[in-house]
């Protein structure tokens, strides 16, 4: 029983071990299958093979580059060898050429010793030198040794070497002989100094270096010593003297400028005016309007019965008035002699005379006067105007303002003697110039307007600066009977006219050439004082105020008649 029991027990244990091993193998096989489920081994093998091929290609390209570079290097080495051989051949030819001129190539002492040693030990090596080499070494020219004592071997060839010493050619091309200089010992070379030398004391501008934590400036040494104080003193004194001279010159120039009188005209004048002596900046002269070929009666002076008339003797053809024509005894006009010209009636100037005479002669001798310009004169050719007679009603021009200039002269009486006297004295002469307006009133000259415009001057009372008289009745050239003028018509006193209404001067009535009957003239003369008909406004405008003047008289040629 023991034998069978042992056999079966062993068989049983063997079966158990087999089962365990089979189980393990199955487990391993199943685990391997699970691992390769995601990626197959053929795929892995393909990836590995592709990586290997890439690496192989990179290696092959790198190897090709190396080979190409090696070939280039070998070609360069071959070219260098060829060049070396050619250079050696050229050097040999040059040596041979130079040897003909006594050139001896330099050989190092060591190489000569080696050659002698090799020649002295031929038996040891067992090789005997060739006889040809020995002959070449012994056949070196000995002439060079003897000639080396007399002249330098390395010198440039000269003419004497070729037997041409008798030709004296310039030798500027020969290099200068440099004398051998002794080498400086190594001890005399500049040494590196570890410490910089101390700088010299030089005077410099003092600088104040302030810091927040310090209350005083940093003290520095500026190189000022007892020897240099005199130089600094001289320099500072020179600066002080220079500044003092500059200030003195400035004060002298300022004193000269203050001492010079200031002239307004010289300041306003331009350099061109000053260079041509035309430093006048006065207002321009007023224009004169006149008609050539027109003869106008001369206006006479009007005064009161108690006052004597002004001196006569004025010439109508003169363009300027002499200062003697003024009444020097008259106290009212005495103060106007120096400042303004005589205030008498002055005739107008025709265009011919104005072109010949200067402009400043027609309006006075004083060029510096800045009074207001005179009013223009408007005339009509072919008309004859009466001369202004003296009237007892008109105020004296020399009287004060408000007394003489406010009265308007009445209408003159129609008398035959007046017509006869005018007809005898003057005929129809169209060459006589037109007279200027009467500017003899005192108020026209006492307060002349300034050149600068002022708003106060344009008020109502300030504009009454001009005082113009009323012209007389014009001369009638038609045949009028003497019976019509025998009636003594006494004119009534006209209303007073303010100074503002007398600003503008009414021109003298021109001569009427139309035929008017005597009856109409008589009727007009009778009713001139009682009735203010339109005809009366035409004949006499003295009593009418300035603002109510009829528009019928606006035309200077009187086209109504």
UniProtKB/Swiss-Prot annotation:
Single GO cellular component term: cytoplasm
UniProt key word tRNA-binding: no
Principal place of residence: cytoplasm
Keyword field: Cell cycle, Cell division, Centromere, Chromosome, Cytoplasm, Cytoskeleton, Kinetochore, Microtubule, Mitosis
A single BP term in Gene Ontology: attachment of mitotic spindle microtubules to kinetochore
Domain of life of the source: Eukaryota
Function: Component of the SKA complex, a microtubule plus end-binding complex of the outer kinetochore that stabilizes spindle microtubule-kinetochore attachments, promotes alignment of chromosomes at the mitotic spindle equator (chromosome congression) and assists suppression of the spindle assembly checkpoint. Kinetochores, consisting of a centromere-associated inner segment and a microtubule-contacting outer segment, play a crucial role in chromosome segregation by mediating the physical connection between centromeric DNA and spindle microtubules.
Entry's family note: Belongs to the SKA3 family.
Quaternary structure (record): Component of the SKA complex, composed of ska1, ska2 and ska3.
Protein name: SKA complex subunit 3
Organism: Xenopus tropicalis (Western clawed frog)
Designated gene of the protein: ska3
